[in-house]
Amino acid sequence: MDAYFDEEDKKRRAENVYRQYPVLRDKKVLLYAPTFRATAEENAQLLEKFDIAKICQTLGDDWYVLVKLHPKFPSENITLHEHCLNMTDYSDITDLYMVADCLVTDYSSTVVEYVLLDKPIILFAYDLDKYDRGFYRDYRSTVPGDIAYSTEELLQLLQKNVDNAQKRQDFAKLQYDYIEGGSLDRVFAILQKE
């Protein structure tokens, strides 16, 4: 987790992305990283509900949308827009976190790491009532961002330029005992005591 607090490492990771995708430099970036679903039909809905054309139109030319689906998702099925890049085959999602200005996800564990960067998060839970994999905590009351239950609600949240800082802070406190880095030093100190 220390990588999320090391400014040099964050810059290096962002530069990895910019070197490969220079069009992203000086643009705002929305990262869409949903969790994998059990059936092909449910997985197809991930991109039907996340209407890339409408989202790109709503965000405007200053934004790029990065789509990072689960590696099991057939990435050739992704229809893109001129302001959207398929990053499904990109090897390290942490690099993508560093260039993203906002994360859109659903039930994915990506929020547990991304929340450490203290950037806006939107939860796109269009199928919450049907999603049956269970949660450790009550989803609606503990997620680190605003929830959109439909494509229209997602578009509205994107237009509002959501912040949700308090929700992120509350979520981070639920997940972590320490939120300032230094994990390696703490582990080393414990090992030295033994």
Residue ranges and their predicted role:
Residues 1-2, 35-39, 71-74, 92-93, ...:
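Short, solvent-exposed loop/turn segments at secondary-structure junctions
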Residues 1-42, 166-170:
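A nucleotide-sugar donor-handling region in carbohydrate enzymes
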Residues 29, 64, 101-102:
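Structural motif
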Residues 32-33, 37, 53-88:
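Catalytic donor nucleotide-activated moiety binding site of glycosyltransferases and closely related
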Residues 44-52:
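Charged helix-capping and loop-helix junction motifs
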Residues 71-112:
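Donor nucleotide-activated moiety binding/catalytic core segment of transferases
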Residues 79-80, 109-176:
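Catalytic binding pocket for nucleotide-activated donors in carbohydrate/polymer assembly enzymes
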Residues 180-194:
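C-terminal alpha-helical cap of glycosyltransferases
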